[in-house]
C-alpha cells in the first residue's frame, strides 16, 4: 500500500488546478463570445453564473476528492452507500479524460508548432494574408508534421508526470503558470500601445445595449451561463483528483474562488490582447482555430517586432494548453495507479502508448481521413469535442451535484462538512434548497441545450 502523494504547497494546488481550468477556450472562445454578446453586460452575467453555478460544482468535485483521497471511481466507492452505482460515473469521467486528450494533444501540438515557426522566423514581416493563412492549411494537410508535434507534446507531458506529483506536475505547473501570468500581462500592455487599442477595448468591455437587443437578452444569458460552466472543465473528475491531493487547512469554496479568479483573469486579459490587436489592423475578431492560427498570425506579421510578439503569444498558448494536458495526464495515471496498483512509471508508459494511438484519428481527420464525417456531419476533432463538451462535462457535473446534495448519494450534510473544513470562505447551510432544486435545473438546461 503506497501512501498517497500530496501537493507540497497550497500555491502548487491552486496553480495546478487553475492550469487545468485555464486552457485554449479562455483565449479562443471567451473574448469572441464577449464581443458577440454586448461586452460588459455579458462579463457581469458570466461572473454571476461562475459564482452561482461553476464554483458550487467545483467545490463538489474537490470535496469528493478530498474526503475520499482517491481517484474518480474509488472516490465514489469510498463515499457512496453500499450497493449503489454512483461509481459507474467514475468510469465515464475517466473515459471523458481520455477522449478530451484524443484531440487536445493535437491542438496543443499546433500551439507548439506556431511557437517554433515564429521563433525561427518562418512568418516573415509583411507576408500577405494569403501566405500567412496558407501556413495553417499546409500544416493540416501534412500528417507527418502534425504527428511530430503531437507526439512531442504527449511524450513531454508523460515525462513530466512520471517524475511524481511534487517534482513533476506541481513543479512544472508553478513555473508555467507564473510565466503564463507574466506573459499575458506583457502581451496586453503591448496591445494597449497599438493605434486601435482604445476602440478595441471599448468594443470588448463597454456594455453595448444595441447588441444585447439584437442578440436577445435570453441568448446573452444562456451564452454567459454556458461560458461560465465550461471554463472550469467540470464533470470529468479533472478537479476531483486535485482535491484528493490537497490539504485540509483551507475551505473548498475559498480555494475554488481563487481558481475561478485566475481563470477569469486569463480569459479577460486574453480579450485585452486580442481586441486591440484586431481593431488596430482592421481584421474581424473571430473564434476558434481560425482566430489563433489565421487571424492573429496575420496581425503579427504586420506588426512592429511581430516575430517577437508572435513568439511570446504562442509560448503563452503553449503553456495554457500544456498545463491542461499534464493535469489530465496526471488524472488518468492516478486512476491506473489506484485501480490496478501500477507504479507511476508504468502508468506513464502504458498511458503514453494509449494516448499516442488514440490521438491519431484527430491528426488524420484533417488529411488522410478528411472525408470522414461523424456526428451530424462533424469532422473527427469536432465529433470528439461534441461528446466531451456537450455530453460528458454537463452530464458528469449533474451527477457530481446530485451525488453531493441528495440523500441517495453522499448527502448534503457530508458534502457541506467537507467543503467547510479549513479556514476561508464557507458555504451557508441555508443554500441547501438552491443546491438541491435550482442548480440541477440550470445544469440540465445546459445539457439539453447542448444536445439539441
What is the role of each PLM region?
Residues 1-28, 57-62, 66-79, 83-88, ...:
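Membrane-interface "cap" regions at the ends of multi-pass membrane proteins
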Residues 3-7, 170, 174-322, 326, ...:
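Membrane-embedded translocation segments of transport machinery
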Residues 4, 108-141, 245-249, 254, ...:
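Helix-loop-helix connectors at the membrane interface of multi-pass transporters/channels
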Residues 6, 12-14, 20, 143, ...:
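Loop-to-transmembrane helix boundary motifs in multi-pass membrane proteins
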Residues 6-17, 42-45, 84-98, 147-153, ...:
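Select transmembrane alpha-helical segments in multipass membrane proteins
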Residues 12-49, 199, 237-243, 254-257, ...:
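Transmembrane helix-boundary motif of multi-pass solute transporters/channels
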